[in-house]
């Protein structure tokens, strides 16, 4: 109780507030329920207030138990036997049963889950690290926190559409201090499907739709495992280009499959997994990118990822193994001409392995208690090729030697940092201000001084600077003489973005928005083929692209349809027009239109 005092809602000198008093009773009640006092409730405490004891308009408060406190609320309870009742996906009542250790399981027709999985979680309170505590009954004290952990963990498995845990006294005697647990659950349908659609258009650039479709098979091996297969595709065509080439000049398609386990598969954590829930995901994928008249890029690979969520607000994702192989195919004469003029572009696209490790930390307090204006922060660090280079070093080769190979193919070596911060200010129920800042840096070294094209940064599009399409600006103040080549080499190794958006309710689920977007990408190293592209402090401010616009959203809570109209205010390159507003051309020519699903940030 004393250790939890720092979380108190009441502090000396603060303004008297009835809401805070109720929150304090709830906090203390939760502390007691986490220590076995199952029947204790906030209403079993009351305040005594006195304004005469403390002068100066202050109130002396004393929190005391209510008179006639029930005897059941004054003693701790222990967890006893457990029973499970599993209903069919259409609500069919159990018609069979089995005993697993001391767990009685009732099910319909066929048991669709492994008994040991249910046993582990319903006996969660027995799994503690301290051997002395395990030897005593203290390990079986009822805990509201552990009840919520068990219920949340089992719900997240995707096995059940309904789940409820009920605790009841073992018998009706006055001295009974044991609670038996009954779990009731209804199986969910084994398959989930997901469809995503996206359309981007701009009157003087690229336009086209994209889509992805995924199917997930839940509870593959009876322990909450899920298997996902996802197909994705998109294509773009040139509008207003004045060329008589094929309308469809770019497309991308791919397929991926992943298998997720609701625990750490390797190494085995044993009892610690109950205090530190985690998942393990194995993923394989293959993507084909076609840039018509230029090249095709085939990428395939796989990774293993551990996800940990030790608290409600923090999440860690560790990828100790991630291997990608890029293959450049079907190079056209036009592309070779561009590559000859820009060797860095060709090097970033050529055949290469990307052996990487990755760590991501995410902080999201939107679901935390008492948070009105939530923040979201995510940072990712990626290291590629370093472990492979260490192995080469062990065999006598220099760590910094270039053109080292893996299976006779060069491999990339770089360090990449990406961080993004978001804040949502809820002014009232009809007005909100959302903001975002994003930074990224990519530094290639050792085996290759040019980072892979697929790892480089770009800006523009429906979720970035909405006055510009994807890869239509940057790096820095560079602007290709041939606009049709722009999306090939308008990437960079340093990224900065800042956005602010005012959202206002128009009518019920219809929201309007006005926004201001800024940002660009730059190169960390000088590139003679792309002048004015290097990151420099003196040119940084004027090379930040700026755009504004308005939008409309249909917010159904679980799904948001969004239509944004963006217009540039400042271009990061020289347009031969003086002043900060250096945009040329008509309003309609520069208007960017984006239709998307979900908020941009």
Residue map of PLM features:
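Interaction-mediating elements
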Residues: 1-156, 161-168, 178, 269
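Membrane-embedded beta-strand positions of outer-membrane beta-barrel proteins
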Residues: 195, 227-231, 282-284, 377-381, ...
């Amino acid at each position: 109780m004393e250790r939890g005092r720092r979380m108190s809602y009441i502090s000396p000198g603060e303004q008297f507030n009835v809401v805070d008093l109720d929150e304090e009773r709830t906090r203390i009640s939760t502390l007691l329920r986490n220590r076995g006092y199952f029947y204790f409730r906030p209403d079993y405490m009351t305040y005594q207030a006195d304004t005469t004891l403390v002068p100066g308009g202050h109130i002396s408060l004393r929190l005391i138990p209510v008179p006639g406190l029930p005897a059941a609320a004054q003693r701790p309870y222990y967890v006893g036997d457990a029973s499970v009742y599993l209903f069919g996906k259409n609500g069919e009542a159990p018609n069979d049963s089995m005993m697993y250790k001391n767990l009685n399981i009732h099910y319909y027709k066929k048991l669709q889950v492994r008994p040991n999985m249910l046993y582990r979680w319903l006996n969660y309170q027995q799994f503690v690290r301290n051997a002395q505590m395990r030897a005593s009954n203290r390990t079986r004290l009822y805990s509201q926190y552990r009840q919520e952990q068990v219920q949340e963990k089992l719900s997240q498995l995707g096995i059940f559409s309904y789940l409820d845990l009920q605790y009841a006294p073992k018998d009706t005697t006055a001295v009974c201090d044991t609670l038996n647990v009954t779990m009731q659950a209804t199986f969910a349908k084994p398959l989930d499907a997901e469809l995503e659609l996206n359309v981007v258009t701009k009157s003087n650039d690229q336009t086209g739709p994209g889509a992805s479709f995924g199917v997930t098979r839940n509870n593959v091996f009876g322990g909450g495992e899920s298997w996902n297969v996802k197909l994705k595709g998109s294509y773009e065509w040139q509008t207003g280009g004045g060329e008589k080439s094929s309308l469809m000049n770019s497309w991308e398609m791919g397929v991926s499959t992943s298998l997720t386990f609701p625990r750490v598969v390797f190494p085995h954590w044993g009892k610690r997994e109950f205090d530190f829930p985690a998942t393990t995901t194995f993923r394989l994928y293959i993507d084909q990118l076609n840039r018509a008249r230029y090249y095709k890029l085939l990428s395939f690979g796989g990774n293993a990822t551990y996800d940990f969520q030790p608290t409600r607000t923090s999440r860690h994702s560790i990828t100790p193994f991630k291997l990608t192989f890029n293959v450049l195919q079907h190079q056209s004469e036009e592309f070779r001409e561009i590559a000859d003029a820009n060797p860095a572009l060709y090097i970033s696209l050529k055949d290469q392995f990307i052996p990487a490790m990755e760590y991501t930390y995410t902080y999201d307090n939107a679901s935390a208690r008492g948070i009105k204006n939530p923040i979201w922060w995510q940072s990712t660090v990626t290291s590629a090729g370093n472990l492979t280079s260490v192995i080469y070093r062990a065999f006598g080769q220099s760590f910094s030697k270039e053109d080292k190979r893996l299976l006779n193919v060069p491999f990339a070596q770089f360090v990449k940092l990406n961080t993004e911060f978001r804040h949502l200010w809820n002014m009232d129920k009809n007005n909100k201000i959302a903001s975002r800042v994003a930074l990224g840096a990519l530094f290639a070294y050792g085996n290759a001084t040019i980072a892979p094209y697929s790892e480089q940064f770009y800006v523009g599009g429906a979720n970035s600077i909405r006055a510009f399409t994807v890869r239509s600006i940057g790096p820095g103040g560079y602007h290709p003489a041939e606009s049709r080549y722009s999306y090939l080499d308008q990437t960079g190794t340093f990224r900065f973005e800042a956005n602010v958006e005012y959202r206002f309710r128009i009518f019920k689920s219809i929201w309007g928005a006005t926004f201001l977007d800024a940002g660009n990408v730059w190169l960390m190293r000088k590139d003679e083929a792309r002048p004015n592209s290097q990151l420099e402090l003196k040119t940084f401010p004027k090379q930040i692209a700026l755009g504004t616009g308005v939008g409309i959203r249909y917010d159904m809570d679980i799904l948001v349809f969004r239509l944004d109209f963006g217009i540039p205010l400042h271009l990061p390159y020289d347009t031969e027009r003086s002043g900060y507003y250096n945009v040329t051309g008509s309003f309609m020519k520069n208007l960017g239109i984006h239709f998307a699903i979900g908020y941009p940030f």
